[in-house]
Amino acid sequence: MNVLNRDDIKTFLPHREPMLLIDDVTMDGDTAIAHYHVRGDEFFLQGHFPGNPVVPGVIQCEIMAQSSCILVRDELVGHTPLYSGINNVRFRQPVRPGDTMEIRARITSRRGMIFFVDAKALVNGKACCSGELTFALIDNK
């Protein structure tokens, strides 16, 4: 199992700071296991909520989506992954500064260049977010 760091991840994903939201990822068979440490100075915490910062749910979903795209890293050359759907998302506990999210993502099916993924995010072993994600690989122009 090779661990990809942020520099490695940038060779596959088009995301860059401040929108690159995974710190490392490891492939374990058909599952991507990624991490993101919430530092507390992220742009999305400004105003969400003053004095009680919580990672917005949509950002948690984006973290899961980026983690999922690593599953098809060999097919990303010449393509951009676009998040195209989300189903059955549940938020179970808040994610706060100082927390490290662990994301587990697995492709459940594929239709051409469209991928369906089950993803779950945990903090300290407890589920904070889960859902079914869909993304498509589109040709770069």
Predicted regions and their residues:
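Short, low-complexity, intrinsically disordered N-terminal peptides in bacterial proteins
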Residues: 1-2, 141
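Hydrophobic beta-strand-centered segment that forms part of the acyl-chain substrate-binding groove
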Residues: 2, 67-102, 114, 130-136
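HotDog/MaoC-like acyl-thioester-processing domains
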Residues: 14, 29-30, 95-99, 104-141
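Conserved positions in beta-strands of structured domains
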Residues: 23-26, 87, 92, 104-108
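Active-site helix/loop of acyl-thioester processing domains in fatty-acid/polyketide metabolism
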Residues: 25, 55-78
